[in-house]
């Protein structure tokens, strides 16, 4: 009986390892769903009293097409297309939907709503795009780059960050 259990250990280990891999792989994909992107955006928007975004498959297709072009070198270069756009990059499974949006929303600390400006030397345009009241549709995509990193793009319709206008 002891021999039988011992001889089954390698296959048990293999099955356990495969199961763990599937769980981790699934959770990684689950952290990048449409709902994950929407929840992260709409939490930030609710904090400033802005209506929630809705998911748009056409905008998401645009985002997917564009990040696919960035996969070769993972350089963040804006598309300058018809939509507002936020880009993020990171390594491994660290760069999830929620993490990308969190990075953009963290710029809130540099935004002064009263003067509608960013603190000197700081960036806050990603944050203002996330909460831009006139942007009502979003589509996002994530791609693994050839260097092993990830690029995330969220695109917004209509685009925000209109000069002279406040986001909310």
Swiss-Prot record:
Record CDD domains: CAP_PR-1
Signal peptide: 1-30
GO terms for cellular component: extracellular space; vacuole
Source lineage: Eukaryota, Viridiplantae, Streptophyta, Embryophyta, Tracheophyta
Family stated for the protein in its record: Belongs to the CRISP family.
Cell compartments where the protein resides: Vacuole
Functional note: Probably involved in the defense reaction of plants against pathogens.
Post-translational modification (record): Three disulfide bonds are present.
InterPro entries noted in UniProt: Allrgn_V5/Tpx1_CS, CAP_dom, CAP_sf, CRISP-related
Name of protein: Pathogenesis-related protein 1B
Induction: Synthesized during pathogen infection or other stress-related responses.
BP GO terms, sorted: defense response; sexual reproduction
Record keywords, A-Z: Disulfide bond, Pathogenesis-related protein, Plant defense, Signal, Vacuole
SUPFAM superfamilies: PR-1-like (SSF55797)
Domain SCP per the UniProt entry, residue ranges: 38-156
């Amino acid at each position: 009986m002891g021999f039988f259990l011992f001889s089954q250990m390698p296959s048990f280990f293999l099955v356990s390892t495969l199961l763990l891999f599937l769980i981790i792989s699934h959770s990684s994909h689950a952290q990048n769903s449409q709902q994950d992107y929407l929840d992260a955006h709409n939490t930030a928007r609710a904090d400033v009293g802005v209506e929630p975004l809705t998911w748009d498959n056409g905008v998401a297709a645009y985002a997917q097409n564009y990040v696919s072009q960035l996969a070769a070198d993972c350089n963040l270069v804006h598309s300058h297309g018809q939509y507002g756009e936020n880009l993020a990059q990171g390594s491994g499974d660290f760069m999830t939907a929620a993490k990308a949006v969190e990075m953009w929303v963290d710029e809130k600390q540099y935004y002064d709503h009263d003067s509608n400006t960013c603190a000197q030397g700081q960036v806050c345009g990603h944050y203002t795009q996330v909460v831009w009241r006139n942007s009502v549709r979003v589509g996002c995509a994530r791609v693994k780059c050839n260097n092993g990193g990830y690029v995330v793009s969220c695109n917004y319709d209509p685009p925000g960050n209109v000069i002279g206008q406040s986001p909310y």
